[in-house]
Amino acid sequence: MTLTACQKDEVSPSAGATSQTITVSIPQGVQTRAAAADFGDGSQIDRCLLQIYRNGQPYGEQQTATVTGNTATFNLRLVAQQKYDFVFWADCSEAGYETDDLSAITLGSDADYTGNDDKFDAFFLCKKDYTVTESFSETFTLRRPFGQLNVKTLDLAAIPDNAADLKPAKVKVNFTSLPNTFNALTGEESGEAAVEYTADVLNATGELTVDYIWAPVEQATLADFKMTFLDAAGKEISANSDFKSIPIRRNYRTMAVSYTHLRAHETGAYL
């Protein structure tokens, strides 16, 4: 997936300063969320942030650009013959990410994470050691810092129609420990925290949940979690605690398949 961003930087002209334009773009897809395949299209991304670094320190204020028509653009004025790091973060402004420091992005204390909510999707890029020699116009592609975890059950059809009360309407998900901080400057996740939420199941075909989880590029975050199946009133039907060491890798979709007492998984690229 790609991203583009835009904002004017009111810097007084100075000797050696040249003008630059950086664009980031996100393809927009369908707005419905009827199936797991509909998640991750980037359609809820509405802002892009840019922090410029020089010699490892922030250079000027963080800038914000509105994503409109899949694109946003930053108009800059930087001193030539210098190297800069460009750090981008693009998200849905309603998600509640704490982004004052792009080297320590977390979900804010007032934000409650839940699965099956695409507003928690996000993109980033760190373009390091970019030497500004003259005016330029660049387009950069952003990537997700997450792996996407999908959970599906395959035994709903085994429940007879006259036992509809045994078909889950909601699920409670308990992750034992997940990364909770992301450094967009280094591209590394860190920290750990238990995560719990309750959400309506995605649909009646057995697709249950979709989660965005901080994950590394090469090796995988190993997720342990329990899923409790609930009826519409929140009463427990059954539970599955057998989700152990599920590998979550950045920019990949992992499908965890649940039966009454079993689970399996498969992983495949989704970007």
Predicted segments, located by residue:
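A surface/extracellular/periplasmic glyco- and lipid-processing/surface-interacting theme
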Residues: 133-176, 180
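C-terminal motif of bacterial Sec signal peptides marking the signal peptidase cleavage site
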Residues: 4-5
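Acidic, proline/serine/threonine- and glycine-rich low-complexity intrinsically disordered segments
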Residues: 256-258
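Tryptophan-paired
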Residues: 39-100, 160-252
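Conserved small/polar residues in nucleotide/adenosyl-binding loops
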Residues: 260-267
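Short, low-complexity, disordered segments immediately C-terminal to signal peptides
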Residues: 11-20
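Short, low-hydrophobicity acidic/polar segments
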Residues: 20-148, 157
